[in-house]
Amino acid sequence: MSAAAYMDFVAAQCLVSISNRAAVPEHGVAPDAERLRLPEREVTKEHGDPGDTWKDYCTLVTIAKSLLDLNKYRPIQTPSVCSDSLESPDEDMGSDSDVTTESGSSPSHSPEERQDPGSAPSPLSLLHPGVAAKGKHASEKRHKCPYSGCGKVYGKSSHLKAHYRVHTGERPFPCTWPDCLKKFSRSDELTRHYRTHTGEKQFRCPLCEKRFMRSDHLTKHARRHTEFHPSMIKRSKKALANAL
């Protein structure tokens, strides 16, 4: 028997003893005539001294209260953890554990992806349900390059198609400028190349009068200005889009 169960047993015995001393059973009440015939000595021996009875009663009450107070601070026993619940969540990921991103590093799994289906939702998902939904959607929209030895992953199928042309050598976007025979695997590469023929420089520096064919060239130049801020280029791009 554990210590906590033993304390409960002793407290129960004390309370039962107190109730037995306080209550007088009905069948134990003898007629007045028979009580008068009992010798005074036997009555005194049966009931004892009232002072001793009161002392015993107070002692039992004190012990019972102490045991009940100790029982309040009994530590709660935690259930033992099953060894099956300690399995690594990576075992359920399958082939996703060796998938690499464009930077060459393994993709990190968010808490929502590592969470078991039967477990309770995390506080983050309760406070921000959109974050959990976004992470789940991103995990379902992975497009891995099928080329042997590559293993790059893209969020959009169009990006994967453009990347796959690097392996196949396909260039479906030819330049339409007269006497130009260049071809490109991506449409944005063709657009940038076409500006070399037209001389178009639509990206103007917000701090000076210089213009550039490519936005990355503009950003590289604008950072040389001491008063440059990235929001300046965003505003200039928005104004250009509205003008077109």
From Swiss-Prot:
Induction field: Expression is highly sensitive to glucocorticoids and shows diurnal expression patterns. A strong induction of expression seen during keratinocyte differentiation in a cortisol dependent manner.
Domain of life: Eukaryota
CDD domains: KLF9_N
Disordered as annotated region, ranges: 80-142
GO terms of molecular function: DNA-binding transcription factor activity; DNA-binding transcription factor activity, RNA polymerase II-specific; RNA polymerase II cis-regulatory region sequence-specific DNA binding; zinc ion binding
Keywords for the protein's UniProt record, in alphabetical order: Biological rhythms, DNA-binding, Metal-binding, Nucleus, Phosphoprotein, Repeat, Transcription, Transcription regulation, Zinc, Zinc-finger
Gene3D superfamilies attached to this UniProt entry: Classic Zinc Finger
UniProt subcellular location: Nucleus
Modified residues (Phosphoserine): 122
ZnF bounds (C2H2-type): 143-167, 173-197, 203-225
One GO CC term on file: nucleoplasm
Claim: Cytoplasm is one of the keywords in the record: no
Name listed for the protein in its UniProt record: Krueppel-like factor 9
Pfam families, alphabetized: zf-C2H2
Main subcellular location: nucleus
Tissue: Epidermis (at protein level).
Protein's organism: Homo sapiens (Human)
Family indicated by similarity: Belongs to the Sp1 C2H2-type zinc-finger protein family.
Task performed by this protein: Transcription factor that binds to GC box promoter elements. Selectively activates mRNA synthesis from genes containing tandem repeats of GC boxes but represses genes with a single GC box. Acts as an epidermal circadian transcription factor regulating keratinocyte proliferation.
One Gene Ontology biological process: negative regulation of keratinocyte proliferation
InterPro entries hit by this protein: Znf_C2H2_sf, Znf_C2H2_type
Summary of subunit composition and partner proteins: Interacts with ZZEF1.
